[in-house]
Amino acid sequence: MSAYRWFALFACLAMSGCASFGEDFVSMFSTQGERELDVGVRAYEDGEYAYSARLLQGSLDAGLRGTSNRVRAHKYLAFIYCTSNRVPQCRDEFRKALEVNPSFTLLEDESGHPIWGPVYRSLKPRKK
């Protein structure tokens, strides 16, 4: 076996022994804001809305990089505000997301949501 094959075999064995290697490797190059965004989205998915909102806002305050990351943070903040009946804050977060990326659209199942769907649609002009 060539040295490259041995190296590939060793690398596969080493990585199979630690499932979180990929996450650990990526987190080495992530900013604080990106890590807070990821944890904030997971907290949202777990129903921890107050904690999620703190993390999402913290990610933005930390200078979150990347258009898609900033839009994602604003979108989840909007969801949290809408579900807690804070419609003006919800609208403001959707507005901020659209300022970051005017092409921002919700997924089909998100835009049809009975609480935040109408708020989002009130800000997003319809295509003719």
Identify what each model region corresponds to.
Residues 66-70, 99-114, 119:
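Boundary/linker segments of alpha-helical solenoid repeat arrays
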Residues 14-35, 39:
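Bacterial Sec signal peptide processing site at the extreme N-terminus
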Residues 58-61, 98-99:
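Amphipathic alpha-helical segments of tetratricopeptide repeats
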